[in-house]
């Protein structure tokens, strides 16, 4: 607990921590476990763009969220609050925290905003509370909150299997991405129940992805048939490149070799679309923020 006292004494009040978005560069479902969870294969690409989580240590043990991370989500149900309380319980610490999130990542778009925010809370409070828990421990805690949380805890681009928690770090080339949020949200369980969803894809290898033969997302045909807004975005993006879906949607993206090319493509899209140009990250900016606290 000495680190908390030092930080308070030094006048460091609120601290800001990045929570990057992600893309699934492909996604296929290969089967189902006995407990009903689906098995998948995917590649997680971290981005240089996302939310910012602001944290302030409390001495009274309370975990409080200030404002609304997501409209309509209660403080107790919010992943950032749950992450902080889970870490507090697992570590047996009496420290508390106040949490505020500046949201940029669209909710329900498959860009990983909620999972990334939760991971950032775990990693940052582990440092701010002086707990010293290993990344493996934090990733295991994160898995209790969501299958995507561990990749954000570890902060590396990764080939993922299992329910998404079996991670193999991989190197990805520099790239820029044109992102579009169609503005619709279909709950993932409803998509998994769809009769159109392919659930028995053949197991692939990392070499298959490296060869460029894996680009499809199993949820794409389901969403394009089900949601006219998603189909409209795919049609618009197909004029500037090869559109893909991230996660279970509804977010869409096109990959480009350079930011300039992505910006040029953005200029050709209808102004009514909610779109961004971002770049892929070699690793999570959260790791850089963590390193800065240890200097």
From Swiss-Prot:
Q: Can you tell me which residues form the catalytic site?
A: 22, 148
Keyword Kinase assigned to the entry: answer is yes
The UniProt record gives the binding positions of ATP as: 106-116
**Annotated keywords:** ATP-binding, Isoprene biosynthesis, Kinase, Nucleotide-binding, Transferase
The protein's superkingdom reads Bacteria
Under catalytic activity, the entry for this protein gives: 4-CDP-2-C-methyl-D-erythritol + ATP = 4-CDP-2-C-methyl-D-erythritol 2-phosphate + ADP + H(+)
Q: Give the record's GO biological process terms.
A: isopentenyl diphosphate biosynthetic process, methylerythritol 4-phosphate pathway; terpenoid biosynthetic process
Enzyme class, top EC level, equals: transferase
Q: What GO MF annotations does this protein's record show?
A: 4-(cytidine 5'-diphospho)-2-C-methyl-D-erythritol kinase activity; ATP binding
Q: In what pathway does it function? A: Isoprenoid biosynthesis; isopentenyl diphosphate biosynthesis via DXP pathway; isopentenyl diphosphate from 1-deoxy-D-xylulose 5-phosphate: step 3/6
Which PANTHER family does this entry report, sorted A to Z?
A: 4-DIPHOSPHOCYTIDYL-2-C-METHYL-D-ERYTHRITOL KINASE, CHLOROPLASTIC
Give a short account of what the protein does: Catalyzes the phosphorylation of the position 2 hydroxy group of 4-diphosphocytidyl-2C-methyl-D-erythritol.
Full protein name: 4-diphosphocytidyl-2-C-methyl-D-erythritol kinase
